[in-house]
Amino acid sequence: MSTHALQNFELHVLVAMLRERGETYSVPLVLELEKRIGRPVSQAAVFIALKRLEQKGLVTSRLDEPASGRVRRYFKVTKQGLAAVEAQRVEHVRLWRGLERVLRVHKA
């Protein structure tokens, strides 16, 4: 697997996409991200992250032209995207391992 450096927000978008299970577009991702990270998220920021992820080969997209209404671009996580999320998860687990005691001491 080619390793691509993921920006923090790109990782958030990939994780939100995995929670949506399958293809999704930017609006549900905005709602999921706002719910999970507890702050406002712009649709433009999500779309920019999606385009970057697509350029890295971590997501694919397709246009859906409905009989009526707006055209939507649907995105889907690729196998490489799934591998990138798993690699980031493993890295974060290693990074945080052993800090529970330190954080409890500072919390007390």
Predicted regions and their residues:
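Short beta-strand/turn micro-motifs at beta-sheet edges
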Residues: 1-4, 62-64
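N-terminal helix-turn-helix DNA-binding core of bacterial DNA-binding proteins
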Residues: 2-45
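Short, contiguous hydrophobic alpha-helices characteristic of membrane insertion segments
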Residues: 2-3, 50, 106-108
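Basic amphipathic alpha-helical segments that dock to polyanions
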Residues: 46-53
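Beta-hairpin "wing" of winged helix-turn-helix
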Residues: 54-71, 76
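Accessory beta->alpha helical hairpin/"wing" motif in late/C-terminal subdomains of nucleic-acid enzymes
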Residues: 77-81
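Amphipathic alpha-helical dimerization/coiled-coil segments
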Residues: 83-108
